[in-house]
């Protein structure tokens, strides 16, 4: 039996080495670009969460509603069941109708994950509510998660849930 080893021409080997280098470089650049886009998207979503609370503080229900996707469904802790977009301002008006307004807040960002056109964020918020004279009426500490979807270049909330913090404030 005769064994013959067939060697590819030397140009063929050089071509494959160059191709492997090109593919490796492309993958490295693509990974970096996606990482930068993800960080940019994360920053955008956190900015929108801050805008959300500024709209609540200013009682700007129109801008607040614009943050929500038409197909939103979520479960705020003040509701006995999940709600849709047509009920998202009820908790705000329930306070303002009693003369109570969000006076201040602070957000503790805990986590965010962006995957393509979906982002999920998790945070705790401290809220101080005051009457029309500015006297503090109550403080709330709440856990919140929102699911954002990017449609037509704009992020909107499509899902969410909130609950009071536990006994240790977490």
Give the residues covered by each predicted segment.
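Bacterial N-terminal signal peptides that target proteins for export
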Residues: 12-23
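Sec-dependent N-terminal signal peptides
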Residues: 22-32
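A solvent-exposed, acidic/Ser-Thr-rich amphipathic alpha-helical stretch
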Residues: 39-46, 55-116, 122-124, 136-140
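Short beta-strand segments enriched in hydrophobic/aromatic residues
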Residues: 68, 125-127, 161-164
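Beta-strand elements of well-folded, non-transmembrane domains
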Residues: 127-131, 148
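Short beta-strand edge/turn micro-motifs at domain boundaries
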Residues: 141-168
């Amino acid at each position: 039996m005769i064994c013959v080893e067939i060697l590819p021409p030397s140009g063929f080997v050089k071509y494959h080495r160059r191709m492997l280098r090109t593919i490796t470089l492309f993958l490295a650049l693509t990974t970096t670009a996606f990482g930068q886009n993800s960080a940019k998207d994360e920053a955008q979503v956190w900015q929108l969460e801050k805008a959300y609370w500024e709209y609540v503080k200013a009682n700007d229900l129109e801008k607040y509603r614009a943050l929500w996707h038409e197909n939103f469904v979520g479960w705020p802790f003040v509701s006995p069941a999940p709600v849709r977009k047509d009920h998202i301002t009820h908790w705000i008006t329930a306070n303002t109708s009693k003369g109570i307004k969000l006076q201040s807040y602070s957000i503790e960002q805990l986590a965010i994950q962006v995957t393509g056109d979906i982002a999920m964020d998790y945070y705790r918020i401290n809220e101080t509510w005051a009457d029309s004279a500015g006297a503090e009426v109550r403080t709330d500490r709440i856990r919140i998660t929102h699911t954002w979807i990017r449609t037509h270049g704009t992020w909107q909330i499509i899902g969410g849930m909130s609950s009071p913090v536990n006994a240790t404030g977490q």
